[in-house]
């Protein structure tokens, strides 16, 4: 094997927006990294579904296409 061709592999502190923190190893040049969703707050892992309504888009969709889904 050749020497000095591989990137540095060091610990990386990952912080989620929910407050969960964990340490992993990475070749990323940073010491810390922030993410929006982790396994502690992702709906797939928690079993809780969240609907994020941005500027009433869900209501607008329901007004426009709500009659298609009524039986």
Curated annotation (Swiss-Prot):
Q: Does the keyword Zinc apply?
A: yes
Disulfide bridge map: none
UniProt key word Metal-binding: yes
Identify the keywords attached in UniProt to this record, alphabetized. Answer: Metal-binding, Ribonucleoprotein, Ribosomal protein, RNA-binding, rRNA-binding, Zinc
For molecular function, the Gene Ontology terms on record are: metal ion binding; rRNA binding; structural constituent of ribosome
One GO CC annotation: ribonucleoprotein complex
Share an example GO biological-process annotation for this protein.
translation
The UniProt family comment states:
Belongs to the bacterial ribosomal protein bL31 family. Type A subfamily.
Q: What does this protein do?
A: Binds the 23S rRNA.
Q: Which cofactor does it need?
A: Zn(2+)
Cofactor binding note from Swiss-Prot or TrEMBL = Binds 1 zinc ion per subunit.
Fetch the InterPro entries from UniProt. Answer: Ribosomal_bL28/bL31-like_sf, Ribosomal_bL31, Ribosomal_bL31_A, Ribosomal_bL31_sf
The protein depicted here goes by the name: Large ribosomal subunit protein bL31
User: What quaternary structure, including any partners, is listed in this protein's UniProt entry?
Assistant: Part of the 50S ribosomal subunit.
Q: Which residues are Zn(2+)-binding?
A: 16, 18, 38, 41
